[in-house]
């Protein structure tokens, strides 16, 4: 792979505010059972086994292991049935972070979308590793840039953070190619969290998500958008420049705002539909919102969806 661009000075540090870390730890405890093992120490697998947790019964058929007969149920119903179990497994969560040029907005010294994506990824890695699950990282622009394989060791957090802070946003985006290559790199199904502004054709995103879903990955899309992009607060005559394309536009922002907001909402609706149609969790991440509020909102929505699914 090509060398990653580095941010000026390369001494930028990424840390979690202790107060935020404490609230995130609380989220771990409250979301354990509801988020399909994302933050849990006990996880369920569709692979049947004899360890851990009793799930349900099914009718006995010749050849079944008699040790699994449910004699209490037989006494009540006069029917032979077999206890079914689910294995506890170690979850692998792959954090896929967009490091393309558009993630470098804004360019005026305020924290960028990429900075915010790094904080989200760091918080999720912290939570996953705290539960002794595997955390992996993949950075991308138009291709997979750097991939750190999953590890369950708490010491794995440091190289994850280092990989995030050593990368500076740059390059164009190709989500279909990136997610397709990612599928080839993932050893087994797990949770894949895509953290990106999703700038690019919606059909390329849809194709990439379909390729992930075909491998039975549980996919989450955290759509990172800056407050300026969501609310278009400009009131003076600025020059708008494309972050990944050579495009410059001089317009009156007040006259443009209604059309911009309408176009933004239509685009977000298309993205949401592309995700929903493929069973993908979709959540907008506003960079102006506190980190723990962002994660709480997303996890709450995810818990509600899982509860509805039963």
What are these regions (language model features)?
Residues 1-154, 191-196, 201-203, 207-211, ...:
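An amphipathic, basic-hydrophobic helix/alpha-beta surface used to engage anionic
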Residues 209-213, 237, 299-301:
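Short, solvent-exposed amphipathic alpha-helical segments in soluble enzyme
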Residues 254-265, 269-281:
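C-terminal or mid-to-C-terminal helical accessory/interaction module adjacent to the motor/catalytic core
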Residues 147-162, 300-301:
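Short, electropositive alpha-helical surface patch
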Residues 156-190, 202-204, 225-226, 230:
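Von Willebrand factor
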Residues 285-310:
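C-terminal "exit" segments of structured domains
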Residues 233-259:
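Acidic, Ser/Thr-rich peripheral helices and adjacent loops at domain boundaries
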